[in-house]
Amino acid sequence: MKRTYQPSKTRRARTHGFLVRMKTRGGRAVINARRAKGRKRLAV
């Protein structure tokens, strides 16, 4: 059986990247929450 996680940098960026997060209100909320928490990496 094939494993469920088949890494791909392109797909990772397209679904969880910074630009994708900034597109929606909820995504911006995620970025802001991570900024407030002091995360080193905001998105992928």
From Swiss-Prot:
Gene Ontology CC annotations of this record: ribonucleoprotein complex; ribosome
Gene Ontology biological process terms in this record: translation
Disulfide topology: none
UniProt keywords, alphabetically: Ribonucleoprotein, Ribosomal protein
Top-rank taxon, per record: Bacteria
Any one Gene Ontology molecular-function term assigned to this protein's record: structural constituent of ribosome
Cross-referenced Pfam families: Ribosomal_L34 (PF00468)
Family: Belongs to the bacterial ribosomal protein bL34 family.
Name under which the protein is recorded: Large ribosomal subunit protein bL34
Organism: Verminephrobacter eiseniae (strain EF01-2)
